[in-house]
Amino acid sequence: MATLTTGVVLLRWQLLSAVMMFLASTLNIRFRRSDYVGLAVISSGLGVVSACWFAMGLLGITMADITAIWHNIESVMIEEMNQTPPQWPMILT
C-alpha cells in the first residue's frame, strides 16, 4: 500500500505542490491572526517554494535543467569579468 501511495505521489507531484501551496496559504492566515509572525514568514516561504515547484513541473523544467542553466550563467559571468578592464569600476574622487 505504501509503495502504491508513494508512486501516486511521485507521479502526481504537481498536485502535491498545489496542496502544499493551499496549506501554506491557510497556515499563513492563521499564524498572522494569532500574532505568530515568524511562523507566518516560514509558511509564506513554503508557499513560494511550492509555487516555484508547481510552475517548474508544469513547464517541464527538471533539476538537471536548472543545473545546466546555472553553469551557463556562471561561465558567462566569468567570461565577462575576464574581459572587463582592470580599472573598472572606476572610483571617482
Swiss-Prot record:
InterPro entries: UCP030798 (IPR016958). It holds the Pfam family YjcB. It comes from the Bacteria. This is Uncharacterized protein YjcB. It comes from Escherichia coli (strain K12).
